[in-house]
Swiss-Prot record:
Pfam annotation, one family: FtsJ
Lineage, uppermost ranks: Bacteria, Pseudomonadati, Pseudomonadota, Gammaproteobacteria, Alteromonadales
Known function: Specifically methylates the uridine in position 2552 of 23S rRNA at the 2'-O position of the ribose in the fully assembled 50S ribosomal subunit.
Source organism per UniProt: Shewanella pealeana (strain ATCC 700345 / ANG-SQ1)
Protein name according to UniProt: Ribosomal RNA large subunit methyltransferase E
Keyword Transit peptide: no
Keywords associated with the record: Cytoplasm, Methyltransferase, rRNA processing, S-adenosyl-L-methionine, Transferase
Domain of life: Bacteria
Positions of S-adenosyl-L-methionine binding: 63, 65, 83, 99, 124
One GO CC annotation: cytoplasm
């Protein structure tokens, strides 16, 4: 991509961002990102998080999903968040900064979870996009596979999983793997997800493995 095209694309994104209804609404409500509305919409439809639940939030920074999750889980609940990027503290959220792909970070995350199983695993993880589909899609699929592996390690029976997946190579195989692990799997495209984005959210309930 030429510098000129990249600049035009970046300018378009910035214009969309500042004109975006959800960006303005997130600022008005004190939410850290427009992504918070995605998990809110999923919660409204699927009721994943209830008071007292333990939630793991992968790819948490800047904290939009964690803000919603900790509010829903309440004082008796627990939210454990992880991201390679730093995140300002959120009351009630136990945040671990590190690369989830690294064994030592995974071990540290599992230590924070402890012996008790968790009720919900959330993943809004995405790789740094290069703009090359043949590079970006495998990276994105690797992250969602790691998120599903996390479910296998920590999720309680009948637990739930919400994960961002980019449609493309590997999507159908991944959907099959999620369906094998959960009783019900739904595909959601929240209103707050940009229409031209290939992202969808798989919402899986009734963990059975």
């Amino acid at each position: 991509m030429s510098g000129k095209k990249r600049t035009a694309s970046s300018s378009r994104w910035m214009q969309e961002h500042f004109d975006d209804h959800y960006v303005k609404l997130s600022q008005k409500r004190g939410l850290r990102s427009r992504a918070a509305f995605k998990i809110e919409e999923i919660q409204e439809k699927d009721k994943l998080i209830r008071p007292g639940m333990t939630v793991v939030d992968l790819g948490a920074a800047p904290g939009g999903w964690s803000q919603i999750a900790v509010k829903l889980a309440g004082d008796k609940g627990k939210v454990i968040a992880c991201d390679i990027l730093p995140m300002d503290p959120i009351v009630g959220v136990d945040f671990l900064q590190g690369d989830f792909r690294e064994e030592k970070v995974l071990d540290a995350l599992l230590t924070r979870v402890g012996d008790a199983k968790v009720d919900v695993v959330l993943s809004d993880m995405a790789p740094n996009m290069s703009g090359t589909g043949g590079v970006d899609q495998p990276r994105a699929m690797y992250l969602v596979e790691l998120a599903l592996d996390m479910c296998h390690q920590v999720l309680a029976p009948n637990g739930s999983f919400a994960v961002k997946v980019f449609q493309g190579e590997g999507f159908d195989e991944y959907m099959k793997a999620v369906k094998e692990a959960f009783k019900t799997v739904k595909t959601r495209k929240p209103d707050s997800s940009r229409p031209r984005s290939r992202e969808v959210y798989l919402v899986a309930t009734g963990y059975k493995l």
